Amino acid sequence: VCKNNIVVANANVIVNIPPFGNPAITGAAIAPSSSQGPTDDGRIKPDITGRGTNVYSCDDSTDSSYGNSTGTSMSGPGVAGSLLLLQEHYNNLNSSFMRSSTLKGLVCHTATDDAENPNVSAIPYPGPDPFWGWGLLNAKFAAQTIIDAQTNAAIVEEKILNNGEIYSFTVNVSGSEKLMATICWTDLAGQLQNGILNSTTPALVNDLDIRITDSDNNEYLPWKLDLSNLPYAIKGDNIVDNIERVEVDLPTAGQYTITISHKGIIPGTTPGSQGIQEYSLIVTGSDLTTTLSNGENELSDFLVWPNPAKEMINYQFASQS
């Protein structure tokens, strides 16, 4: 199963639409025909769930016929259409489109956890699972996060991690809602498992990490599947997924440090060289304000040219590691 795509599950979702007020989910369950994860190496798949049962859509009876259909052939297009609208919304505000990793990270970050809705037939524990993925697509929350990022009430950023770099910054929260931070990246192609069935070797090439630390130095770790106790998820060092989400469920008001780093060496384009990894960062919470931490990088080289300069300068740096 590919690392960088978005795998969509099919759920039977019942929505109550009142004459006034907001629609509400009154029932939902994964369709029996919807494929389940995880992958052989333990990655969280599917990624997201959409409504795909008894969906009114066009059919192949005539040129103009419609009918009810069921399957991921319904949930997949529904999710894809929502993602296109999110791209349009982002472009309207930023005059550019999101990277695929940003879009994927955003919808997984803002998904409605199936365990948090009492009307959903789900795994009775929070976090991702191999049936729903990260949960039901929540396009409203995703769109609001894009809006909130305009006023620094949320973070939706596209960044680059250099080999050996540790990127760290702090956020101040009021403590009135959950603090969540997600990174997602388009990973390089892994080793071909030619002729090997059910290989548990991680397909991940560049293993990025995200952590949240509070003022008492308590460290919060990302979700990962508990392969010894499926379908449940636990929090720990995730070495297989190219999306990681960390949560502080009941944050106290104050300052939290978010740190992004990586294991091993980020390979370059030529054998033996060192490279970079583009990644996307999404953070939501309450009344976020951000500041970069001091000394977030220790550098072995820092080059600036030309010198003297008139209008433009170039710079290049390398970390000590």
Question: Where are the regions that the model predicts?
Answer:
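Structural recognition of the beta-strand scaffold that forms the well-ordered cores
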Residues: I6-A9, P46-G50, Y56-S57, S75-G76, ...
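Acidic glycine-/aspartate-rich tracts in secreted/extracellular proteins
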Residues: N12-V15, T53, T112-A115, T186-L188, ...
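Hydrolase catalytic cores
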Residues: T49-N119
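Short proline/glycine-enriched turn/loop motifs at strand-loop junctions of beta-rich domains
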Residues: G52, W185, V205, A318-S321
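C-terminal edge strands of extracellular/lumenal beta-sandwich accessory domains
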Residues: T102-K104, Y167-F169, N198-L204, R211-D216, ...
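Secreted peptidase-domain scaffold signal
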Residues: P128-N206, D214, S273-T291
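Surface-exposed, proline-anchored Ser/Thr-rich loop/turn motifs
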Residues: G295-Q320
